Amino acid sequence: MNHFDTIIIGGGPAGMMATISSSFYGQKTLLLEKNKRLGKKLAGTGGGRCNVTNNGNLDDLMAGIPGNGRFLYSVFSQFDNHDIINFFTENGVKLKVEDHGRVFPVTDKSRTIIEALEKKIAELGGTVITNTEIVSVKKTDELFTVRSSDQAWTCQKLIVTTGGKSYPSTGSTGFGHDIARHFKHTVTDLEAAESPLLTDFPHKALQGISLDDVTLSYGKHIITHDLLFTHFGLSGPAALRLSSFVKGGETIYLDVLPQMSQQDLADFLEEHREKSLKNCLKILLPERIADFFTQPFPEKVKQLNLSEKEALIKQIKELPISVTGKMSLAKSFVTKGGVSLKEINPKTLESKLVPGLHFAGEVLDINAHTGGFNITSALCTGWVAGSLHYD
């Protein structure tokens, strides 16, 4: 039976970074992955370009991690988004920053990121075994035994980095939650996060239209980002981010011109009162959006009476949209819920119930926005879980 100091189950970003960290600290380390290649889900992030992190400050990170982000203060004090940027830069990956602080490889290829992680694992002497599905994990005395259908390994330290349950075709089947339950850990309810929104909005009229930096709001939750109208409802970063706060049955509000106040809009209409209403709004909005807003109103701006003008402005600034639901967990980008953080040491990510057992990445009850935040959480928790901690 092969013995290692540390075994990591799951070869996504958290697992690869945990392997690098563990190997860096001199541990004989094994990474086990069920797919043929490491980073299968990572390969599809950012439209295949791999939005590897976000270059914001700590407050930005906290805002980008709505699901228990404060748990990560200790993690980020050890390894944060700027350490991620330094790591890839020092390992030969040129990075660039795009809108909203999103960081990508200059190549615009996720393989660049995955290959840099794989190369570092090899350089540090980590062992990787792919195409291997784990069937059981148990602990006897001080040793964990990890078994596949035809092999077994032992270790003193076990790190579970199997991800959540979104996009199960990439390998995120929830197996890590089964391991957690086996060791008597609590797994909180799992649901879709960063999910497109299903709505009863007139989708076909606006299908395919994308808007930059509009505002979606629900109660105190206000998200300003890009939005895409689809055949089923709303997608794009604004909708994905708001999905963390709705389930279905809520009314959300869309402001397509957040940069203008209601008074600004009233002044603009008055300034262009001789124009047709459609041509007036086309100055500010895409033609099909302008068409949508002008349908119930008179043809000319100057023909609007006061109540019609107020109604038009209110529609543009506070368009009510009924949310009927979200895409299923399997079709969402992120899993909300996971291994309860009450049972995890925030400094080491070690189990409070089982010495030597650690969790990192999306298997934990932490959910972050797209835009580099979810991968940041995975990479940083992976590094910390793999590290050696001295009291």
Swiss-Prot record:
Induction pattern: Constitutively expressed. Up-regulated in the presence of peptone. Part of the aao(So)-mutT operon.
GO molecular function terms listed in the Swiss-Prot or TrEMBL record: nucleotide binding
Entry keyword annotation includes Flavoprotein: yes
Cofactor: FAD
SUPFAM superfamilies assigned: FAD/NAD(P)-binding domain (SSF51905), HI0933 insert domain-like (SSF160996)
EC number: 1.-.-.-
Keywords: FAD, Flavoprotein, Nucleotide-binding, Oxidoreductase
Binding positions for FAD per the UniProt entry: A14, E33, I134, E362, N374, I375
Phenotypic effect of disruption: Inactivation of the gene causes the elevation of the cytoplasmic levels of the prooxidant aminoacetone, resulting in an elevation of cellular reactive oxygen species (ROS) levels and ROS stress. The deletion mutant no longer produces H(2)O(2) from L-amino acids. The deletion mutant exhibits slightly slower growth than wild-type strain. Double deletion of both aao(So) and mutT is lethal.
Pfam families membership: HI0933_like, HI0933_like_1st
Family: Belongs to the BaiN/RdsA family.
Role noted for this protein: Flavoprotein that probably catalyzes the condensation of two molecules of aminoacetone to yield 3,6-dimethyl-2,5-dihydropyrazine, which is subsequently oxidized to 2,5-dimethylpyrazine. It could be involved in a microbial defense mechanism related to aminoacetone catabolism through a pathway yielding dimethylpyrazine derivatives instead of methylglyoxal. It has also low aminoacetone oxidase activity, and can produce hydrogen peroxide from aminoacetone.
Subunit structure: Monomer.
Domain comment quoted from the record: Composed of three domains: an alpha/beta domain corresponding to the FAD-binding domain, a beta-domain partially modulating accessibility to the coenzyme, and an additional alpha-domain.
Name of this chain's protein: Aminoacetone oxidase
Organism field: Streptococcus cristatus
